């Protein structure tokens, strides 16, 4: 087990490639707005240095976002909700936390929610898998149509 990956201080839970590949086959992603040079899932991506929260996500196609899982996650969910008005699908992979304000403000009743069965085995920056995550996950899909306020 990779103890650093499962630490509560860790905010980087890298998407398992096979999990991404299944979603990518469905949506054909063009942008990963919350990546690093090593973890980017799309040829177009933003890093912490280029700050995906301050950039437009309108790059002509679907967006895949597995944001940092820290206190800022609500800002990423709000950004996805707002960017979905651009007409392209936006797909988030986030912890399944229905008790949060961002869930009620920007997800519930406004997006498709797919709860992930079991616990994902996230990876580190080098693709090394850990034990199953200590939290459940969900895929949140803004379908590119006008989202409900």
Where are these regions (language model features)?
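Class I S-adenosyl-L-methionine-dependent methyltransferase catalytic core
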Residues: 1-149
